[in-house]
């Protein structure tokens, strides 16, 4: 008997669950299902630009599992685009994680990933393009 799938943390809040070619009724289209964890892997790797290890850490899964999810999601989206199919986003063993509003590090363990060595200020700086405040140097302290 296989072991149960590990729950994956997803921080994507969906407003839309279907994508389809314009002008064709959904009932006339073939559709493919993109899992929520696959969509999250796409978001982390392709939108946020995270490396596989950081994306896996953010989702609470192993790096090989993240890579497998990403490959499956890219294949699903590419097939739907090339064939003109609808994409239904749903399912998967997921748990809704905290929103990425820049107030905290996206992964709770700040050892790896986007907050490595810089803490939450570093993550916010990368999102906004600003540098985090630096500590004063010894020369500035003497003034």
From Swiss-Prot:
Feature: compositional bias, Low complexity: 116-126
Extent of the signal sequence: none
Organism superkingdom: Bacteria
Positions of region (Disordered): 100-143
Pfam families according to UniProt: DUF134
Cysteines engaged in disulfide bonds, as pairs: none
InterPro entries for the chain: UPF0251
PANTHER family: PTHR37478, UPF0251 PROTEIN TK0562
HAMAP family: UPF0251 (MF_00674)
Family: Belongs to the UPF0251 family.
The name this protein goes by in its record: UPF0251 protein Rru_A1194
Organism of origin: Rhodospirillum rubrum (strain ATCC 11170 / ATH 1.1.1 / DSM 467 / LMG 4362 / NCIMB 8255 / S1)
């Amino acid at each position: 008997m296989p072991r149960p799938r590990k729950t994956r943390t997803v921080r994507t809040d969906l407003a839309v669950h279907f994508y389809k070619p314009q002008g064709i009724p959904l009932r006339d289209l073939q559709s493919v299902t993109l899992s929520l964890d696959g969509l999250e892997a796409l978001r982390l790797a392709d939108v946020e630009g995270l490396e596989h290890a950081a994306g896996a850490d953010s989702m609470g899964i192993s790096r090989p599992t993240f890579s497998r999810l990403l490959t499956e999601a890219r294949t699903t989206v590419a097939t739907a685009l090339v064939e003109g199919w609808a994409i239904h986003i749903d399912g998967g063993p997921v748990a809704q994680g905290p929103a990425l509003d820049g107030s905290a590090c996206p992964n709770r363990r700040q050892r790896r990933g986007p907050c490595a060595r810089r803490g939450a200020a570093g993550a916010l700086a990368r999102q906004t393009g600003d540098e985090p405040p630096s500590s004063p140097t010894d020369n500035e302290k003497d003034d």
